[in-house]
């Protein structure tokens, strides 16, 4: 029987860290190895094909930074993790130096997770890649690695989605001291790829099959609707990790341990005027999501 490789395909600022802790710490469904996010597949795709769209130099510089972080196993100061999910974990029993280098290949990726699985298989059901940039992988690239991955793994894909406006507000808080103007700039221009939930779902379904892709609605999952994910993974949950983003408390959110990446992002509260401004101009995102997913979650657009 092949081991299961769980691919989490974002999205950032939608509680991927609490989801990571729920599956990999609190319940021991899967283990991610040396770190949560190495962005290996994104680096591999970008390394093979730098798209020259007028921002080619910027993308190369970004790729260089990702490679440097990969080679030093550095996730960033704001992504401090519990020991069990770091390179110092009792479950990480190899150095991974061949994988954590600037020279990347799909063969190294496969070997890394097969090696890790053999070390954890008595305690965990699967291995996992929780790199948020998996959400940005192109359909063409995923098709190019699909057969090789399926030779060695059963692939399951999850992705967690938060109300688009509230998520974009957290992004704006993180990226600018003036989030009101920043979010209006985003709404009036080209949005980041993470905003297009429908496209993320469609690309992954087209490659891995709808039966192997499970979108999670953040607000619903943390409100208690956990059984659909448990059924998808064929694994019962005994605990759901706390989530700074639910219930949404804005700047008054609790400072839970190991979730600084969440509570540092909402320093200014979303006011009604800004929310309504964004909802009016981003209604197409909600409608596109409905077309792909089948409905707009009741807790969105509030």
Set out the residue ranges of the language-model regions.
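Surface-exposed cleft-lining segments at the edges of enzyme active sites
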Residues: 95-100, 129-135, 180-192, 265-274
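A generic "structured core" feature
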Residues: 2-12, 17-24, 28-30, 39, ...
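PAPS-dependent sulfotransferase catalytic core
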Residues: 1-124, 130-131, 208, 235-288
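PAPS-dependent sulfotransferase catalytic domain
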Residues: 28-29, 37-38, 46-47, 54-57, ...
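Alpha-helical packing segments of well-folded alpha/beta enzyme cores
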Residues: 105, 109-116, 141, 197-201, ...
């Amino acid at each position: 029987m092949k081991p299961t490789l769980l691919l989490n395909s974002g999205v950032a600022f939608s509680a991927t860290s609490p989801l990571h802790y729920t599956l990999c710490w609190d319940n021991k469904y899967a283990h991610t190895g040396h770190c949560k996010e190495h962005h290996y597949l994104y680096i591999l795709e970008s390394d093979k094909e730098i798209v020259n769209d007028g921002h080619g130099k910027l993308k190369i510089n970004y790729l260089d930074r990702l490679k440097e972080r990969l080679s030093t196993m550095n996730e960033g100061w704001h992504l401090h993790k519990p020991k069990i999910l770091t390179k110092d974990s009792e479950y990480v029993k190899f150095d991974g130096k061949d994988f954590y280098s600037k020279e990347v290949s799909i063969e190294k990726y496969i070997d890394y997770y097969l090696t890790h699985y053999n070390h954890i298989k008595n305690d965990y059901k699967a291995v996992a890649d929780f790199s948020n940039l998996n959400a940005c992988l192109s359909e063409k690239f995923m098709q190019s690695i699909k057969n090789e991955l399926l030779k060695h793994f059963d692939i399951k894909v999850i992705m967690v989605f938060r109300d688009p406006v509230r998520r974009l507000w957290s992004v704006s808080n993180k990226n600018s001291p003036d989030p009101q103007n920043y979010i209006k700039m985003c709404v009036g221009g080209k949005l980041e790829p993470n905003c297009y939930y429908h496209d993320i779902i469609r690309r992954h379904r087209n490659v891995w099959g709808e039966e192997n892709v499970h979108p999670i609605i953040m607000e619903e999952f943390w409100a208690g609707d956990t059984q659909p994910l448990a059924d998808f993974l064929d694994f019962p949950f005994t605990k759901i990790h706390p989530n700074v983003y639910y219930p949404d408390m804005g700047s008054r959110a609790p400072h839970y341990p190991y979730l600084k990446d969440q509570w540092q992002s909402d320093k200014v509260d979303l006011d009604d005027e800004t929310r309504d401004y964004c909802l009016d101009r981003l209604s197409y995102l909600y409608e596109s999501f409905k077309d792909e997913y089948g409905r707009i979650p009741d807790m969105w657009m509030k």
